[in-house]
């Protein structure tokens, strides 16, 4: 059973596969069926990613909190023949927490817009830091081939030195390459600058 849906962008989302709603076995990136999302690490359920603890926690909360809210008063009524105010209040609190759990895990519109840009060049609307290393490396190599064909530098310093000269249609590619290249400070700053320029041209 796949539950704990978070970070949804245009039908793409992160979720967790559970056994009997109790044991999390894998976190997955799930996308609408498309040849572009057929990547290393994919199976019939989705693309295997690193453990996303928000998805795991919300998966538990969305299943067990409403169940506990319903079962608690039923058990007390069956065992003791009536309900105490404390039990009723506890059920209300559990239901309120369940509602919050279903509303949690949404991305702000700014982040959705950023992930859409990545999706235009990779097919994946997910931050590369959440992917398995093998999946990330394959996507990075693919983007690198396109960068090389376009004669665009492939180091953070090189990219920034020609940033203003890169044609706007190529900016999603350059931004995607910088995001997939690594999580160290130089690449993060390079990616941020690339995205800033893309936004300026997109206005």
List each model region and its residues.
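A composition-biased, non-transmembrane "mature-region" signal
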Residues: 1-203
